[in-house]
Amino acid sequence: ERLHAQGHPIHVVDALAINTISVADAASLVTDVLRERELRGVVIVAHSKGGLIGKRLLIEDVDGRVAQLIAIATPWHGSSLARYVPGRVIGALRPEDAAIVALEANTEVNARITSIYPALDQHVPEGSQLEGATNIEVAAVGHFRVLSDPEVLDAVVAAVGR
């Protein structure tokens, strides 16, 4: 709401819904939406797995549509806890998952990423610092609770266009 109030158009990709598809498939879906809506200079604001999708978009952005990614509580290095949760959706967040390894290896786009993360994230014990990115740790505690923290909201607004 604050970004919209400052004149930034907001586009939600409803098709992602609860985000149970792979990072690659989700990035492809978002790319299609960006093209259909003829969007350029896009700043993606994403949470958790959404940050992984955003990084893949930056890497594969042959049209130059995405300017920046602001990621909140993103498991850039995976989550060791994903090993203990059955199913492919969470399992894809294991540190050794091929998609995680590939995204981690590609550092060329990291300078265009702002990673905002809580002081303690019970779902991402490895943390959300990303080498080469602008890293902002906030005092909030919790993987989801961070989304409503005023300090995080301030950091997102400040990061747009940085």
Q: Where are each of the predicted segments found?
A:
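Serine-dependent carboxylesterase/thioesterase catalytic core
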Residues: 2-15, 20-111, 123-124
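C-terminal catalytic-base region of ester-bond hydrolases, centering on the histidine
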Residues: 107-162
